[in-house]
Design a protein with these regions (language model features):
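Terminal amphipathic alpha-helical/low-complexity segments used for targeting or macromolecular assembly
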Residues: 1-55, 60, 191, 197, ...
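Glycine-rich hexapeptide-repeat left-handed beta-helix
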Residues: 17-19, 111-113, 118-220
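Residue-level recognition of the GNAT/N-acetyltransferase active site
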Residues: 53, 59, 71, 129, ...
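Residue "hotspots" at secondary-structure boundaries inside conserved domains
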Residues: 54-56, 74, 186, 202
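Glycine-rich active-site/cofactor-binding loop and its immediate structural neighborhood
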Residues: 58-103
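Periodic small-residue-enriched repeat registers in elongated scaffold domains
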Residues: 92, 104-106, 115-117
Length: 220
């Protein structure tokens, strides 16, 4: 199969970064300039946002736990919930109606509207689509054990990203089970499901069910 592009994964109407992402073919290409985009976007926000610290903009109807740590640059959208102990390390664009859960860490990432990483998750150098959801303890690993650049592979093509750190691209409404591990450079298509404890490498097409590393079925 082909490597999934931004247009295959995401409805760009569900993120403030839609116009920005539309400039690129693959999700990873948007990560280098993400911090600069967030800084510029933050300056355009109106009175329904508060700059709670330099370059950290939070919608007034978002709920931020007192123990959450939020570093710049970050934008957090309307009605979004950031729970106790969450660590947002900056370069994070978090949409409306999203959830960043307890003891969850996120950096250099886009969460589309309605995306949820609610319990003990790690999401680095990644993009999570509209209403994508990661179960408790699921992680988007972004660094190879051999410290090499991350490559995206399918049986048809190989994409050299040139990035030392690259997490995952989760398509709209993708569901990731508890304690699943998404290996660096993994891509999960729209409406696909990954079962708990599964390790995902490479590219999973849309509307699939990943039952284990070797068993992928159509989602009916």
């Amino acid at each position: 199969m082909k490597i999934l592009r931004i247009e295959d994964l995401f409805d760009l109407s569900h993120t403030a970064a839609g116009n920005y992402l539309s400039r690129f073919s693959y999700g990873y290409e948007a990560l280098d300039g993400l911090a600069d985009f967030i800084r510029a976007y933050g300056k355009t926000l109106g009175e329904d946002y508060t700059e709670i610290s330099p370059e950290v903009y939070v919608a007034k109807d978002a709920h931020i736990a007192p123990s959450a740590v939020i570093e710049a640059p970050t934008v957090i959208g309307h009605r979004t919930e950031v729970r106790p102990g969450a660590f947002i390390r900056g370069s994070a664009l978090i949409g409306d109606d999203a959830v960043v859960g307890n003891s969850t860490e996120i950096k250099n990432a886009v969460l589309f509207d309605g995306a949820q990483i609610p319990h003990y998750n790690y999401v680095g150098d990644s993009i999570l689509g509209y209403k994508a959801h990661m179960g408790a303890g699921a992680v988007a690993s972004n660094f190879r054990a051999d410290h090499g650049n991350v490559t995206v592979r399918t049986d048809e093509e190989t994409l050299e990203t040139g990035r030392r750190k690259l997490g995952t691209m989760l398509g709209d409404r993708a569901e990731i089970g508890c304690h699943a591990v998404l290996c660096p450079g993994s891509i999960v298509g729209r409406d696909s499901i990954v079962y708990p404890l599964v390790r995902v490498r490479g590219v999973i097409a849309g509307k699939k069910i990943v039952k284990d590393h070797d068993t992928v079925a159509d989602r009916k």
